[in-house]
Amino acid sequence: MWALRAAVRPGLRLSRVGRGRSAPRAAAPSCPARALAAVGRRSPGNLEGPWGGGRGLRADGGRSRTGDDEEEPEDADENAEEELLRGEPLLPAGTQRVCLVHPDVKWGPGKSQMTRAEWQVAEATALVHTLDGWSVVQTMVVSTKTPDRKLIFGKGNFEHLTEKIRGSPDITCVFLNVERMAAPTKKELEAAWGVEVFDRFTVVLHIFRCNARTKEARLQVALAEMPLHRSNLKRDVAHLYRGVGSRYIMGSGESFMQLQQRLLREKEAKIRKALDRLRKKRHLLRRQRTRREFPVISVVGYTNCGKTTLIKALTGDAAIQPRDQLFATLDVTAHAGTLPSRMTVLYVDTIGFLSQLPHGLIESFSATLEDVAHSDLILHVRDVSHPEAELQKCSVLSTLRGLQLPAPLLDSMVEVHNKVDLVPGYSPTEPNVVPVSALRGHGLQELKAELDAAVLKATGRQILTLRVRLAGAQLSWLYKEATVQEVDVIPEDGAADVRVIISNSAYGKFRKLFPG
């Protein structure tokens, strides 16, 4: 469909700021009904693009029937999910030369109390450089006392900013470093500056989309995009209505806006249903892990703090390939490792957190973050070489508290200070933390010992010495169901003293199977 777009069309040529023209738009058809006809005279349920839900009202392309509550085949579900993942990119493709504009709030609730503008700009710059072909050509920190107004800045600063942007023909777009822009604000700024303007939400969401690998992550990104589609809908439909007499689809009694809003609601419902199916599968996997009684350690931290590198160092898994960029990990993965006690644990790599991360993104990734709530221990990785390490810690803890995690899980959290090799002579000033360098391998044994003790305490496992008969099945059962640390054979008795780490439930089974 030609008209309604959730984002910038790929390859769209942006007008130069010096020419004072907005980006060209396609000519509108004479009425919304003709726009619908342009897609092949399909029914509203068949609209394509970011608003449509697929090729039909049923996942298999057929029509749904009243009272038809049979479960759809799995391959139909797969096809329907792929349809939901289709959509236009949120940001323009190709090389972009970005002007980074940071509003420096001087007072009021919008003023950050724990950070400085220069570090906020540095993080925003890192976000831009995460995108292929994007570079920051100008950075402007502009003070404001009115961040909630439509144009964000005062009259004098706004005029000065507009003059600089329009006078720089090398600028192709502006990244306004605010969490979200209202649709009227975006419209006014783009009209004033002559280039497209993006906020933090849009940039981060586009990075999420680029880095999502599994279907679950891609569906969660699609769900997070829904507020953006809604905010763009009114603007795009208003453009479609310009010069049009009727706003209603012929014979439907439904306006074009109402139609698109309904399609959005239907698409969101389908995404949530698909995520619910995947959530149930994830629940089954967790049950299997629980039956095998592997302790689970969720590794959390600020984005690019070195979580994946640390997991690779702890497990020795050569298949793990860390990347030095923001939000490199969006898909939760589990990796087995062995602690000094010979206990096998699963390290769960999670999505990195970010300050001013829009709440809707966290909500959309709730299925992924459920793994944190079901873990036995949380390992909080901090990049102590970063000048904003304390602010990053506060952001992570605030996000974890927002997940409604059990209090014992938060209280037992282990904190590790990573990248100490970048801070000469580093010595932690906080108690109960472990300094390491995941890249250099420093401090890993101390960290494993700390995790060993913490897992034993968190899971209620106990270290016991059990005497077993060598001729029986007891020893092989213990090797399968517990962690055998040491076996001291007593030949004259035909027995052995076995030192094990065993859970309460496994010990109960052992006593029941081998009484006496």
Swiss-Prot record:
GO CC, any one term: mitochondrion
Q: Name one GO molecular function term.
A: GTP binding
Q: Where is the composition biased (Basic and acidic residues)?
A: 57-67
What residues does GTP bind to?
Answer: 301-308, 327-331, 349-352, 418-421, 437-439
Q: Where does Mg(2+) bind?
A: T308, T329
Something else the entry says is:
The gene coding for this protein is located in the pseudoautosomal region 1 (PAR1) of X and Y chromosomes.
Q: What is this protein called?
A: Putative GTP-binding protein 6
* Annotated source species: Homo sapiens (Human)
What gene does the UniProt entry assign to this protein? GTPBP6
